[in-house]
């Protein structure tokens, strides 16, 4: 058996077409959606991510602003800029690209963003709302994974789901969204004693560790859906995920490739969250 590929690129194009239509409708009413992106420092990966986010806004009818600062920017100046963006009616979403330089407290920065503009879904108010099942924004990567599972009609109610990784950005919110969908969820991490004992019983596995080959064929239940959130480089410098793709695709029922799987969905869901924020604001001021 060879797994069916979950095509994140194709799904993201469909969702972006919907975003563009909604953005056009808002703009026609004088409410063009706007995303502010802030980059501090010169991390090469962050520069690529930010460039892709700004381009995605432009391509789909969203306005965007891009503030780029040197790595030695004082924390107080960054917080002051966030305060300005919070009060700017043209901006519906604020994204501060992580990681930040060591002298800047990322928690303080995230908490400075107005919850109604926190389109990454990282603010403590939004994290708490996610816990209670009433999120204002769902974090982009887990939200994208849920859209993929739904698009391929992978059943979650009553399913055993394993999330490998416990980060605030992916692992924890991923587990909560799967739980909300009716799955029985296990979170595994670096201290888990026997990872394979958990994954072999899973109908759905989401790997989000940043470790190559954390999931291999003998660890996967035949027919399972395997979602690879990882972004790594192999020995030849080629982009790869956390999953041993060549081996696992011969056992799994569904699998996401890297690249072309979860990656395109993350930016797409950022656009979706920004559109939702703009629609919410337009409705409140109608």
Curated annotation (Swiss-Prot):
Binding site for NADP(+): 165-167, 190
Classification via CDD domains: NAD_bind_m-THF_DH_Cyclohyd (cd01080)
A Pfam family annotated for this UniProt entry: THF_DHG_CYH_C
Keywords per UniProt: Amino-acid biosynthesis, Histidine biosynthesis, Hydrolase, Methionine biosynthesis, Multifunctional enzyme, NADP, One-carbon metabolism, Oxidoreductase, Purine biosynthesis
InterPro entries per the UniProt record, alphabetical: Aminoacid_DH-like_N_sf, NAD(P)-bd_dom_sf, THF_DH/CycHdrlase, THF_DH/CycHdrlase_cat_dom, THF_DH/CycHdrlase_CS, THF_DH/CycHdrlase_NAD-bd_dom
The EC number(s) this enzyme carries: 1.5.1.5, 3.5.4.9
Gene Ontology biological-process entries: L-histidine biosynthetic process; methionine biosynthetic process; purine nucleotide biosynthetic process; tetrahydrofolate interconversion
Any one GO CC term of the record: cytosol
Domain of life of the source: Bacteria
A GO MF label: methylenetetrahydrofolate dehydrogenase (NADP+) activity
Pathway in which this enzyme or protein is active: One-carbon metabolism; tetrahydrofolate interconversion
Catalytic activity: (6R)-5,10-methylene-5,6,7,8-tetrahydrofolate + NADP(+) = (6R)-5,10-methenyltetrahydrofolate + NADPH; (6R)-5,10-methenyltetrahydrofolate + H2O = (6R)-10-formyltetrahydrofolate + H(+)
Subunit field text: Homodimer.
Similarity remark: Belongs to the tetrahydrofolate dehydrogenase/cyclohydrolase family.
Protein role: Catalyzes the oxidation of 5,10-methylenetetrahydrofolate to 5,10-methenyltetrahydrofolate and then the hydrolysis of 5,10-methenyltetrahydrofolate to 10-formyltetrahydrofolate.
Protein name as annotated: Bifunctional protein FolD
Species assigned in the record: Paraburkholderia phytofirmans (strain DSM 17436 / LMG 22146 / PsJN)
Gene: folD
């Amino acid at each position: 058996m060879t797994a069916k590929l979950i095509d994140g690129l194709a799904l993201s194009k469909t969702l972006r077409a919907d975003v563009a239509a909604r953005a056009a409708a808002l703009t026609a009413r004088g409410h063009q959606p706007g995303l502010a992106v802030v980059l501090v420092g010169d991390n090469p990966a962050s520069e690529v991510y930010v460039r892709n986010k700004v381009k995605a806004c432009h391509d789909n009818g969203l306005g965007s602003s891009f503030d780029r600062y040197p790595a030695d920017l004082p924390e107080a100046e960054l917080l002051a800029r966030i305060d300005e963006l919070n009060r700017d009616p043209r901006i519906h979403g604020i994204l501060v690209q992580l990681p930040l330089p060591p002298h800047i407290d990322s928690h303080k920065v995230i908490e400075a963003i107005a919850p109604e503009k926190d389109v990454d879904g990282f603010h403590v108010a939004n994290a708490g709302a996610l816990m209670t099942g009433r999120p204002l924004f769902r974090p982009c990567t887990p939200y994208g994974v849920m859209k993929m599972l739904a698009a391929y009609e992978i059943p979650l109610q009553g399913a055993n789901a394993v999330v490998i990784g416990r980060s605030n950005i992916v692992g924890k919110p991923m587990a909560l969204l799967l739980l909300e969908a009716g799955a029985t969820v296990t979170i595994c991490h670096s201290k888990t004693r026997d990872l394979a004992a958990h994954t072999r019983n899973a109908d759905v596995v989401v790997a989000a560790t940043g470790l190559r080959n954390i999931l291999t064929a003998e660890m996967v239940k035949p027919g399972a859906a395997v979602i690879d959130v990882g972004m790594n480089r192999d020995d030849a410098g080629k982009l790869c995920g956390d999953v041993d793709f060549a081996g696992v695709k011969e056992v799994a029922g569904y699998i996401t490739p890297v690249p072309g799987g979860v990656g395109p969905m993350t930016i797409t869901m950022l656009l979706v969250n920004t559109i939702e924020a703009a629609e919410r604001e337009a409705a409140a001021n109608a």
